[in-house]
Structures are given as C-alpha cells and as structure tokens.
C-alpha cells in the first residue's frame, strides 16, 4: 500500500460521490463510473470485484509481438480500474510476461499482485517465491497462495511466517475443476486463511452448497477462477440469443451475463477471467459496473441457460 494507491482510492471515492474535477483535460464525471469494490473480510481493505487471470493467455513465451499485445490487454484492465492480477509458476512463461507488461503499462491502477506456490518440495516454495518476485519485479506480493493444496501443510506454515515478517500481505489456498472439495473445506475450517480461490460459474455451482457458505462464515475472501468454464460457456450458449431481460441488470453480451451471475453471489469477493483480447477485456470490465442480479434473477438466469 503506498501514497499512489491512497490517492487513487480518494479519487474513486470523490467520483462515487459525484464530485468532478479536471483529469487529463476532461471532467471526472465524464469518465465511466468506478467498478464495484468489495472488502477483504480479514482486514476490510476494498478491492475491485473483477481481476484478471493469466493462465494460458499470458503464457506466450518470448514473442515480442504477443507480449506487446498482452501489454495492451493489461493497459485496458488498469484503465478500467482493475487491480488484482493472478498468476502461478505453473503457468509457463506467464509470470515473466507479466513482469514485461508491468514495466510498459502507463499510469496503472495500484496493482494487487497474487501468485502461488506450486511444488511438492519444501525448499522449492522459497525458490518459487523468489523467482516470482524477480519475474514480476515486485518486492512484496499482496497475496501468496498454495496452489491446488500441493504440500499445503508445509507451505501454509511458511506463508504464515512470511505474512508476519511482511514478505506477503495475505495468504490463501486454491483449487479448480471441482477437485478435492472435502480436503479444501477441512483446510478452510482449520486454518486462518485470508483468501480461498475456487471454480464457480453458472453451470459449475457445487461450491454454493458448502465452500461459499463456509468462506462467508469463516471471513475468507473468495476469488473465482474459470467463470467462463475456460470458454466452454461461450461454446455452449454463445450462439443463442441473450434474453432481453438481461439488460435490466446491465448485461449486453454473454460475457457480462456470466460474470454478473458470479459477482452477484454475496460470498464472492473477486472473479479473475482470463483473456488475450482487448475487446474482451473491455466487455469483462463493464460487467463490474451497474446493477447486479438479485436472488430471483439469478434463478431465472440458471433456468434460462439450462433450457437452451
């Protein structure tokens, strides 16, 4: 947390209050409304409800052309108020590419950096953290997570030490694809986690039964991965018409329909869709603005897609 992040938050607060002042020659009132924010339960710090994942999309190797295209994607993310970027040593060159992009974006929002430890080796966790710091160009990660519970007992104990010493600000665990939910719930119950990351979307709703209520009870922030089912939702439903009533909660395309379903769950703190396209990033970020579907509308959304 630095002076820049505080000033940014102050600007967003003033904007939300309807106060306008010059910014780049334009009144602030002319800019898009700030995206929705949610508090991290363990501290109350507010973060945007929409972050960015990097799995596959930022694993582009050393290609200058592809890296520069990702700079444009990250620039749009920051221009729209995005903050949380999530990656992992598991994601090939994604962390290296992220470091490349962070050095080249202009006037970014305050980054909320999130990465993971993914190794069965005890000593390997330290090696991965140091490598992530070097690749990103970050001296302190906001969030460090144990990826897919791999060697979680050892790594989580180390993360607790790192948090106390100030090497990281928050700690958490992750799962995806619906794996190991029983084990995941046990760790949630037993450990003082700031964040949990899991898969949730309009078709994959198993976490509604246990993990999301448990996170709410335990005061753990929830990051949602695979909100588009890795593109599967578009393949299944993208050729069907969007219902007219989706405009009532501001969804003008399927991406916003799917994201607003995820973001409207009261236990969800942030979703991290991944994209390599500037236009898709624009659509995604718009989903974090405006009204969200209520409980009745959420049921209507589920019923609609299940009938297609």
Ranges and model annotations:
Residues 56-67, 116-122, 248:
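Active-site mouth loops of central-metabolism enzymes
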Residues 25-53, 63-64:
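C-terminal segment of N-terminal export signals and the immediately downstream linker at the start
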Residues 86-101:
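Glycine-rich, proline-tolerant flexible connector loops at the mouths of alpha/beta enzymes
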Residues 21, 40, 192-195, 210-308:
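Structured C-terminal cap/extension of enzyme domains
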Residues 40, 52, 85, 98, ...:
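Conserved, mostly hydrophobic/aromatic
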Residues 1-19:
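N-terminal secretory signal peptides and thylakoid transit peptides that target proteins
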Residues 41-44, 99-108, 132-137, 163, ...:
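Acidic (Asp/Glu)-rich catalytic clusters
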Residues 61, 119-206, 210, 217-223, ...:
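Glycine/proline-rich, positively charged
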């Amino acid at each position: 947390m630095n002076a820049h992040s505080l000033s940014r938050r102050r600007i967003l607060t003033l904007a939300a209050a309807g106060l306008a002042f010059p910014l780049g020659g334009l009144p602030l009132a002319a800019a898009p409304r700030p995206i929705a924010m949610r508090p991290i339960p363990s501290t109350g710090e507010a973060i945007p409800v929409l972050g960015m994942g990097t799995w596959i999309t930022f694993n582009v190797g050393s290609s200058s052309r592809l890296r520069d295209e990702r700079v444009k994607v990250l620039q749009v993310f920051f221009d729209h108020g995005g903050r949380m970027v999530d990656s992992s040593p598991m994601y090939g060159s994604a962390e290296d590419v992220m470091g490349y992009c962070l050095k080249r974006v202009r006037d970014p929002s305050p980054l909320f950096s999130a990465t993971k430890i993914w190794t069965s080796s005890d000593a390997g966790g330290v090696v991965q953290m140091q490598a992530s710091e070097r690749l990103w160009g970050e001296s302190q990660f906001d969030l460090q997570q144990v990826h897919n519970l791999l060697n979680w007992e050892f790594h989580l104990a180390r993360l607790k030490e790192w948090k106390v010493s100030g090497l990281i600000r928050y700690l958490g665990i992750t799962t995806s694809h619906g794996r190991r939910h029983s084990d995941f719930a046990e760790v949630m119950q037993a450990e003082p986690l700031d964040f949990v990351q899991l898969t949730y979307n309009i078709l994959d709703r198993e976490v509604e039964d246990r993990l999301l209520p448990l996170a709410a009870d335990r005061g753990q922030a929830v990051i949602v991965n695979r909100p588009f089912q890795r593109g599967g939702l578009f393949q299944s439903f993208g050729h069907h018409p969007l219902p007219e009533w989706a405009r009532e909660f501001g969804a003008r395309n399927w991406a916003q329909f799917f994201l607003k379903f995820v973001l409207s769950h009261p236990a969800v703190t942030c979703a991290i869709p991944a994209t390599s396209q500037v236009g898709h990033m624009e659509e995604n970020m718009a989903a974090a603005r405006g009204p969200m579907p209520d409980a009745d509308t959420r049921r209507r959304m589920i019923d609609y897609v299940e009938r297609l």
